[in-house]
Amino acid sequence: FDESFGFQGPSTYEKTPLGEPA
């Protein structure tokens, strides 16, 4: 859980500002 974005997702994934997998 990446609290920096407030969305669930593996920290190994690059995420968009929404916290979704890039």
UniProtKB/Swiss-Prot annotation:
GO terms for molecular function: serine-type endopeptidase inhibitor activity. Transmembrane segments: none annotated. Coiled coil: none annotated. Residues 1-22 are annotated as: Disordered. Hemolymph. Keywords: Protease inhibitor, Secreted, Serine protease inhibitor. It is found in: Secreted, Extracellular space. One of its GO terms (cellular component) is extracellular region. Inhibits chymotrypsin stoichiometrically. Also inhibits porcine pancreatic elastase and trypsin. This is Chymotrypsin inhibitor.
